């Protein structure tokens, strides 16, 4: 069903480093990521679950699965978007996340909305 244009969701991610919530001396690097999920298909659909693969700079990978996002299972009409912000802690200055959302259209069709890999990185300051 992934190639059917009736069932298409676009995901945009904007990550940022949270210096004020990080303690590098203790190996704690906090990142926030803002997500925009838009129903680009022709059928209303609900986001049911999330699946993340989080990889730190040492190659350690963690799988995170759960219902909905930020306590919600948003229902999106065609063209409608849902925004949320969440966060993650890493033990390294950089890493990446990728994953997908499980979606169910109003007609009962199940499909996934892929989340392309994005980089989490502490910005460098030039002196």
UniProtKB/Swiss-Prot annotation:
- Report disulfide bridges, numbered on this chain: none
Q: Where is the ApaG domain?
A: 3-127
GO BP annotations listed: error-free translesion synthesis
Q: Which InterPro entries match?
A: ApaG_domain, ApaG_sf, Uncharacterised_ApaG
Q: How far does the signal peptide extend, from start to end residue?
A: none
Q: What is the superkingdom listed in this entry's lineage?
A: Bacteria
For this protein, the parts annotated as crossing the membrane are none
Q: Fetch the HAMAP family from UniProt.
A: ApaG (MF_00791)
Name the NCBIfam families for this protein. Answer: PRK05461.1 (NF003967)
| Annotated protein name in UniProt | Protein ApaG
The organism named in the record is: Xanthomonas euvesicatoria pv. vesicatoria (strain 85-10) (Xanthomonas campestris pv. vesicatoria)
């Amino acid at each position: 069903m992934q190639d059917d244009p009736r069932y298409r969701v676009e995901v945009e991610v904007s990550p940022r480093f949270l210096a004020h919530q990080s303690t590098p001396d203790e190996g704690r690097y906090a990142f926030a990521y803002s997500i925009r999920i838009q129903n680009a298909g022709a059928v209303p659909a609900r986001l049911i679950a999330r699946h993340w693969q989080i990889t730190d700079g040492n190659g350690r990978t963690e799988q995170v699965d759960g219902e909905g996002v930020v306590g919600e299972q948003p229902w999106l009409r065609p063209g409608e978007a849902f925004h949320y912000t969440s966060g993650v802690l890493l033990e390294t200055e950089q890493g990446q996340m990728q994953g997908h959302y499980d979606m169910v259209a109003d007609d009962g069709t199940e499909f996934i909305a892929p989340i392309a890999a994005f980089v989490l990185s502490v910005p460098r300051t030039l002196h």
